[in-house]
Swiss-Prot record:
Its EC number is 3.1.26.11. Homodimer. Interacts with PTCD1. InterPro entries: Metallo-B-lactamas, RibonucZ/Hydroxyglut_hydro, RNZ2-like, tRNase_Z_dom. This is Zinc phosphodiesterase ELAC protein 2. Residues 27-38, 208-224, 808-820 have a biased composition (Basic and acidic residues). Residues 1-16 form a transit peptide. Disulfide bonds: none annotated. The modification Phosphoserine is found at residues 199, 208, 212, 229, 618, 736. It comes from the Eukaryota. Keywords: Endonuclease, Hydrolase, Metal-binding, Mitochondrion, Mitochondrion nucleoid, Nuclease, Nucleus, Phosphoprotein, Transit peptide, tRNA processing, Zinc. The keyword Nucleus applies. Residues 15-24 have a biased composition (Polar residues). Zinc phosphodiesterase, which displays mitochondrial tRNA 3'-processing endonuclease activity. Involved in tRNA maturation, by removing a 3'-trailer from precursor tRNA. Associates with mitochondrial DNA complexes at the nucleoids to initiate RNA processing and ribosome assembly.
Length: 826
């Protein structure tokens, strides 16, 4: 295999050196055009909505049950359509883990323009785009259109998917499964006041990238890309949108055996018009005898309704109770409501007015509650892998926690169920609760499974013997700084690795975040449990390396949750220092203008101002930098441009006690980073891809594992932690011979201190035993890939040229600045 790898490196080296010059930027491989999705072709064959009758199977399923770390989200399934109600941070990760496929998700309904409801929407849209979905329609508050414009600041123009906004004032929406009615509800503070966005009904508004923006802009204002408006919009938190969903009538099923008994021509072409007639409720005449439709068909299902309503606080209770549309569905309604989904805190549920409103739906209506009283575990795979890693080293891999249930819910006279992750309510074919898919987190099962793996127990015992006689140097025994890896995957959140975020606890009362991808707050909750407010209270700064979604879309939730945490701790709110590319301000400004006030939460330091030799013309920025260094007890906070997208930075933190932590962000091997990080105590470097994928790493402007290790060795770093792995390496990356006593592998929720450095390389044997099956699969994939490359090289004649040249030549590093990535890398 070594000879095969050498030949492949030789062929690859010749191909790259002959095919490009140093001055050329790495070319991007064209993606093959996606075929139309199968379900879209099927939909075309079915014809217009409702022509073939309603679906046979419809159910609602809880994606996120309302806990503080997961929010509230609901998935609705029929064989014709898929729907999502709310899309907060982490929803995409939960759907991926629990196999709730997003490929057919062409309708998303949002109850409120609040980050808890839309925090995961940008990532979900990017994923839908990559699946080849041609169109997605979003329904909800009026600011939704501006929000979708704003995310183009970091996502690009979103070509390839048509996004349409259905305003809450639009008429009902109808498709093959159901009719949806939107009900705008204003809190008591806004009732009776003119609502400027309540315009006459208008058709769907497409978000065209070509939409013009203001032609003039102040150079001091954040730069907004073409197509993003600079105008301040209507920002209103007093509006929620409820949804009433009415299933279409489902015609009865034709009784084949009964038809045979009656002598009907079953199995012939003549039976088709008979089936069509009786399903439409018409009688037929056969051999002089009239046969009623009910003799040959089961009764039709007229189609139940379900309601999704959010009541954020007590100011919305009276408007909900008095809403005329709801009243038409209460009591003796023509269309009985089978289920009401309440996204409401306990303070609302205990209010007698709200309880009476619930009772008016009648005793046959079920009620599902999604709120903070949920005690359900959502991220099962994360708990499982952490429990198993904890067997190797309990301190480095601490067990995860979950939020305790705050208190027992109110006792109501209506049938009420507290939401749990994956709980189902089936509307068709039979109305019933289904609990078989609900997650149960059983740590004992996880432990038994790990202990039964070949060589695992033996390797753990050998590891413990090897480290018990290797004490850390005296100067490294301090608990601080403490590094908590919260997200170690790239591109999109997945079931085991979340996207980029690393918490650096500088001292017991001071910490900072290195990047802040979607779901970072949820990771903090699972790591710290009910101590999360204390941790947020210590947060002094956030460094955002660049504007790809997997590195910054968790920031807003951190800001909002930090405000709540400081209030609970009795501390005043003060702005959080954010070191980031100045382009981040444009996104925050747009969200602030259109959706929710957030700018008072931050004081921004442009990352370029912390580069070596940078001139700082603003006294305000100088004061912020001084505050950053003083608060974090740092001698220096330095940044440098790295080789990734435009405006991508790495950083180096130098503490007054002498230690130095360097963070690469996303980058190819970068000399500027090597210089900045000289003699680092710890280098945290991305290692997105395995060795052998150097060409793909150049395409995507990332590093391989050996390239990352090489950077650390040239930097003379005391220790190197590899991070930001492609999600194809879900559990563990492929280890290479370049792994040495200075190299460790990061996992989500891993806790590392400098005193752990001697221990880290010794973790590799038990890790290999724990993940032996996964490593074997990855090695098989690598061997197949290498064989394909050999065949391709033989066909092109490159292999023969490589053999004639003798020694394999090292792949030449590219020194040019890579082209900007538009969305994200795998």
């Amino acid at each position: 295999m070594w000879a095969l790898c050498s030949l492949l490196r030789s062929a690859a080296g010749r191909t790259m050196s002959q095919g490009r010059t140093i001055s050329q930027a790495p070319a991007r491989r064209e993606r093959p055009r996606k075929d139309p999705l199968r379900h879209l072709r099927t939909r075309e064959k079915r014809g217009p909505s409702g022509c073939s009758g309603g679906p046979n199977t419809v159910y609602l399923q809880v994606v996120a049950a309302g806990s503080r770390d997961s929010g509230a989200a609901l998935y609705v399934f029929s064989e014709f359509n898929r729907y999502l109600f709310n899309c907060g941070e982490g929803v995409q990760r939960l759907m991926q883990e629990h196999k709730l496929k997003v490929v057919r998700l062409d309708n998303i309904f949002l109850t409120r323009m609040h980050w808890s409801n839309v925090g995961g929407l940008s990532g979900m849209i990017l994923t839908l785009k990559e699946t080849g979905l041609p169109k997605c329609v979003l329904s909800g508050p009026p600011q939704l259109e501006k929000y979708l414009e704003a995310i183009k600041i970091f996502s690009g123009p979103l070509k390839g998917i048509e996004l349409a906004v259905r305003p809450h004032s639009a008429p009902e929406y109808e498709d093959e499964t159901m009719t949806v009615y939107q009900i705008p509800i204003h809190s008591e503070q806004r009732r009776g006041r003119h609502q400027p966005w309540q315009s006459p009904e208008r058709p769907l508004s497409r978000l065209s990238p070509e939409r013009s923006s203001d032609s003039e802009s102040n150079e001091n204002e954040p730069h907004l890309p073409h197509g993003v408006s600079q105008r301040r919009g209507v920002r209103d938190s007093s509006l929620v949108v409820a949804f009433i969903c009415k299933l279409h009538l489902k015609r009865g099923n034709f009784l084949v055996l009964k038809a045979k008994e009656m002598g009907l021509p079953v199995g012939t072409a003549a039976i088709a018009p008979i089936i069509a007639a009786v399903k439409d409720g018409k009688s037929i005449t056969h051999e002089g005898r009239e046969i009623l439709a009910e003799e040959l068909c089961t009764p039709p299902d007229p189609g139940a309704a379900f309601v999704v309503v959010e009541c954020p606080d007590e100011s919305f209770i009276q408007p909900i109770c008095e809403n005329a549309t709801f009243q038409r569905y209460q009591g003796k309604a023509d269309a009985p409501v089978a289920l009401v989904v309440h996204m409401a805190p306990e303070s609302v549920l205990v209010d007698s007015r709200y309880q009476q409103w619930m009772e008016r739906f009648g005793p046959d209506t079920q009620h599902l509650v999604l709120n903070e009283n949920c005690a359900s575990v959502h991220n099962l795979r994360s708990h499982k892998i952490q429990t198993q890693l904890n067997l190797i080293h309990p301190d480095i891999f601490p067990l995860l926690t979950s939020f305790p249930c705050k208190k027992e819910g109110p006792t109501l006279s209506v049938p009420m169920v507290q939401g749990e992750c994956l709980l189902k309510y089936q509307l068709r074919p039979r109305r019933e609760w289904q609990r078989d898919a609900i997650i149960t987190c059983n740590p004992e099962e996880f432990i038994v499974e790990a202990l039964q793996l070949p060589n695992f127990q033996q390797s753990v015992q050998e590891y413990r013997r090897s480290v018990q006689d290797v004490p850390a140097p005296a100067e490294k025994r301090s608990q601080y700084p403490e590094i908590i890896f919260l997200g170690t995957g790239s591109a999109i959140p997945m079931k085991i690795r979340n996207v980029s975020a690393t918490l650096v606890n500088i001292s017991p009362d001071t910490s900072l975040l290195l990047d802040c991808g979607e779901g970072t707050f949820g990771q903090l909750c699972r790591h710290y449990g009910d101590q999360v407010d204390r941790v947020l209270g210590t947060l002094a700064a956030v460094f955002v390396s660049h504007l790809h979604a997997d590195h910054h879309t968790g920031l807003l939730n951190i800001l909002l949750q930090r405000e709540q945490a400081l209030a609970s701790l009795g501390k005043p709110l003060h702005p959080l220092l954010v070191v980031a590319p100045s382009q981040l301000k444009a996104w925050l400004q747009q969200y602030h203008n259109q959706c929710q006030e957030v700018l008072h939460h931050i004081s921004m330091i442009p990352a370029k101002c912390l580069q070596e030799g940078a001139e700082i013309s603003s006294p305000a920025v100088e004061r912020l930098i001084s505050s950053l260094l003083r608060t974090c007890d740092l001698e220096e906070f330095q940044t440098c441009l790295v080789r990734h997208c435009k405006h991508a930075f790495g950083c180096a933190l130098v503490h007054t006690s002498g230690w130095k932590v360097v963070y690469s962000g996303d980058t190819m091997p970068c000399e500027a980073l090597v210089r900045m990080g000289k003699d680092a105590t710890l280098l945290i470097h991305e290692a997105t891809l395995e060795d052998g994928l150097e060409e793909e790493a150049v395409e995507k402007t990332h590093s391989t594992t050996s390239q990352a290790i090489s950077v650390g060795m040239r930097m003379n770093a005391e220790f190197i932690m590899l991070n930001h792995f492609s999600q194809r390496y879900a559990k563990v990356p492929l280890f290479s011979p370049n792994f040495n006593e200075k190299v460790g592998v990061a996992f989500d929720h891993m806790k590392v201190c400098f005193g752990d450095f001697p221990t880290m390389p010794k973790l590799i044997p038990p890790l290999k035993a724990l993940f032996a099956g996964d490593i074997e699969e990855m090695e098989e994939r690598r061997e197949k890939r290498e064989l394909r490359q050999v065949r391709a090289a033989l066909l092109s004649g490159e292999l023969a040229g490589g053999l004639e040249d003798g020694e394999p030549q090292q792949k030449r590093a590219h020194t040019e600045e890579p082209q900007a990535k538009k969305v994200r890398a795998q």
